[in-house]
Amino acid sequence: MQVFRGIEMPYVNIKITKEGATKEDKEKLVSGVTQLLADVLAKNPATTIVTIDEIETDNWGIGGELVTERRKRGV
């Protein structure tokens, strides 16, 4: 939770692999997460901050292996 000039500002950071999420996909993520915080936690959508970081698959590992290599195997 961020506080700016006494106003609580929920902050959500979404990290996804950089594999073709469109602007429309990202708009849906931002809208959906904002609405979820409003519905579940009664947070004000006007002060909710959502950021999306797209990480190259060469910079993301799962189970000791780069996502790039996992994708080559269809995992």
Labelled PLM ranges:
Residues 4, 14, 25, 42, ...:
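Short, intrinsically disordered low-complexity segments
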Residues 8-23, 27:
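N-terminal acidic leader/helix
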Residues 18-20, 70-75:
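Short, surface-exposed, charge-dense and proline/glycine-enriched linear segments
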Residues 20, 42, 61-64:
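Glycine-centered flexibility sites
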Residues 25-53:
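Amphipathic, hydrophobic secondary-structure cores in small proteins
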